[in-house]
Every structure is written in structure tokens, then in C-alpha cells.
Amino acid sequence: MIGYLRGRLHLVTPEGILLETGGIGWLVRTVTNRSWPAPGTEIAVYTQLVVREDAMELYGFTRPEELHLFTLLRGVNGIGPRGALQILGAAKPEQLSRAIAAGDSAFLTALPGIGAKKAQRLLLELKDAVLKSGLVDGTETEAIPAGGGDNDEALAALLALGYSREEIGPILARVRQELGNAAPTTAVLQAVLKTFGRGGGD
């Protein structure tokens, strides 16, 4: 099993990087929005080899926390390695871990490729694993309200993303006024994130 590679960054591709080590070029799939240093720079990645019937693919991450979450996500029914990589490209490990530990389905459904049913499955299968892994302090989940209404769900998701209540309050109120109180949480989140310049979309 290849768990770690250190070498010279040879090329950044649309799907990852080409890492040269010992005269061998390793094609490593990574999150597509990662900022990499200039070619020729020495870097290190934590890796996992995924073996399929028709191919072997190496996935790499700059932090061990990302690799651990990637492994956990792959274990959820309906989430493959590329789906897990897409999720990790949309949320930082700390944000994703807090959302899972807090049972925050609103945050999860705002991520690409995750609908309501998949979010519930993810929470059911990973909440205990995330809490036991040390990826998140159990006390951090207390800051996220349990929810009950759409306002609470949207607020919880935005808090999990790292925004403060002071930042969220006025924008969330304006979006609610524009979209109406019956607007689904996902639509509210997308509108708020667009205001912050982070976009939305499924």
C-alpha cells in the first residue's frame, strides 16, 4: 500500500498532479481547487490506492485529516472515491467534521452530490466515527443549534462554514425576505454563499 509520497511536482493536471519521485512519475488525483506551488517544488502527499476492476487510481491529500475523511466517506454506501474527492473539494476537513458531528444535514445537502437521503445516510454511518476519530471536539457541536425550522438549519450550516452570527444575521434576513419563508434551506444557503462570493450550486 502506498501511503505517502514526497517528490518534485512535475505537472498540475485537470484531475490532479504528476509527482516525480525516484525517476518515476506518479499520477495522483487530488481536489481540483487546490492551489499548488510552481512545478519543480518538492511536495508531499498522503495517498490511498483505489483498485477497481478496470483501473488503479492513486488519490492524494496534503493533510492526513483529509485522507482520513476520504476513507470514511468512501465507506458510505453510494459515495465512491471521486464523489468523496468532490465533497472534500467543497468543504474543509474541520467544517465537514463539525457538520457530521453536529448532525447538520443542511450543511451536507449544500455540498455537491449530496441529497437529503444521502446526507442522512452519511450522518448515520459517520457521526460516531468522526467523534471517535478526534477530528472534532465534541464540545464544538454545542455551538450549532439543534434546529427545527429552516432558519435554524440555514444558520447552523453557515456557522459550520465558519461565519459569525454578526456576518450571517443581516444577509440571512435579507435573503429570507427575498425568497420567502417557504424557501428550502438549500436555496437559502446558495443565495447567502453567493453574496459572500463562494457560490452555490448542486
From Swiss-Prot:
<dbReference type="GO" id="GO:0006281">
    <property type="term" value="P:DNA repair"/>
</dbReference>
<dbReference type="Pfam" id="PF01330">
    <property type="entry name" value="RuvA_N"/>
</dbReference>
<feature type="region of interest" description="Domain I">
    <location>
        <begin position="1"/>
        <end position="62"/>
    </location>
</feature>
<dbReference type="GO" id="GO:0048476">
    <property type="term" value="C:Holliday junction resolvase complex"/>
</dbReference>
<feature type="region of interest" description="Domain III">
    <location>
        <begin position="146"/>
        <end position="202"/>
    </location>
</feature>
<dbReference type="GO" id="GO:0005524">
    <property type="term" value="F:ATP binding"/>
</dbReference>
<dbReference type="GO" id="GO:0009379">
    <property type="term" value="C:Holliday junction helicase complex"/>
</dbReference>
<dbReference type="Pfam" id="PF07499">
    <property type="entry name" value="RuvA_C"/>
</dbReference>
<comment type="function">
    <text>The RuvA-RuvB-RuvC complex processes Holliday junction (HJ) DNA during genetic recombination and DNA repair, while the RuvA-RuvB complex plays an important role in the rescue of blocked DNA replication forks via replication fork reversal (RFR). RuvA specifically binds to HJ cruciform DNA, conferring on it an open structure. The RuvB hexamer acts as an ATP-dependent pump, pulling dsDNA into and through the RuvAB complex. HJ branch migration allows RuvC to scan DNA until it finds its consensus sequence, where it cleaves and resolves the cruciform DNA.</text>
</comment>
<feature type="region of interest" description="Domain II">
    <location>
        <begin position="63"/>
        <end position="141"/>
    </location>
</feature>
<dbReference type="Pfam" id="PF14520">
    <property type="entry name" value="HHH_5"/>
</dbReference>
<comment type="subunit">
    <text>Homotetramer. Forms an RuvA(8)-RuvB(12)-Holliday junction (HJ) complex. HJ DNA is sandwiched between 2 RuvA tetramers; dsDNA enters through RuvA and exits via RuvB. An RuvB hexamer assembles on each DNA strand where it exits the tetramer. Each RuvB hexamer is contacted by two RuvA subunits (via domain III) on 2 adjacent RuvB subunits; this complex drives branch migration. In the full resolvosome a probable DNA-RuvA(4)-RuvB(12)-RuvC(2) complex forms which resolves the HJ.</text>
</comment>
<dbReference type="GO" id="GO:0005737">
    <property type="term" value="C:cytoplasm"/>
</dbReference>
<keyword id="KW-0238">DNA-binding</keyword>
<dbReference type="InterPro" id="IPR000085">
    <property type="entry name" value="RuvA"/>
</dbReference>
<dbReference type="InterPro" id="IPR003583">
    <property type="entry name" value="Hlx-hairpin-Hlx_DNA-bd_motif"/>
</dbReference>
<dbReference type="InterPro" id="IPR010994">
    <property type="entry name" value="RuvA_2-like"/>
</dbReference>
<dbReference type="GO" id="GO:0000400">
    <property type="term" value="F:four-way junction DNA binding"/>
</dbReference>
<dbReference type="InterPro" id="IPR012340">
    <property type="entry name" value="NA-bd_OB-fold"/>
</dbReference>
<keyword id="KW-0234">DNA repair</keyword>
<dbReference type="GO" id="GO:0009378">
    <property type="term" value="F:four-way junction helicase activity"/>
</dbReference>
<keyword id="KW-0963">Cytoplasm</keyword>
<dbReference type="GO" id="GO:0006310">
    <property type="term" value="P:DNA recombination"/>
</dbReference>
<keyword id="KW-0233">DNA recombination</keyword>
<feature type="region of interest" description="Flexible linker">
    <location>
        <begin position="141"/>
        <end position="145"/>
    </location>
</feature>
<protein>
    <recommendedName>
        <fullName>Holliday junction branch migration complex subunit RuvA</fullName>
    </recommendedName>
</protein>
<comment type="similarity">
    <text>Belongs to the RuvA family.</text>
</comment>
<dbReference type="InterPro" id="IPR011114">
    <property type="entry name" value="RuvA_C"/>
</dbReference>
<keyword id="KW-0227">DNA damage</keyword>
<dbReference type="InterPro" id="IPR013849">
    <property type="entry name" value="DNA_helicase_Holl-junc_RuvA_I"/>
</dbReference>
